[in-house]
Amino acid sequence: MIVPTSHEAMPNFNVLLEGAWLVRDIKTEDDAIGVAISEAGKRLNQKKMDFVEVEMGQWDCPECGDPLAGVFLVASTALVALLFEIKIFNAESEEHAGRIAKSTIGKALGAIPLRVLEIDTIG
């Protein structure tokens, strides 16, 4: 029988998720962004997840590649791109860290579509 001589620590990751937040009965893009960030923060804080950073995302123009504001407003309804950043400790792999992040944040936010954008290993 081979006995390991040392325990290798599992890596830690910084995970960035993108979410699509719908805001109804809104007049301006700025108001939609404020409401989306506020509502997301409130849901995260209710679950004691104030360690998750929330900010507005952006889209890239499919034609020219220039960044566009992460909000689309039509008929008093806005779709706001939000970014959620969380540190995941002791994950088995990048993929595992992404699944943990989506599950953890997804449970707090409810029916908000999430997608992993970026995963970085941290010290």
Residue ranges and their predicted role:
Residues I2-T5, A9-K27, I37, G41-F51, ...:
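Helix-coil modules at protein/domain termini and other flexible surface or pore-lining loops
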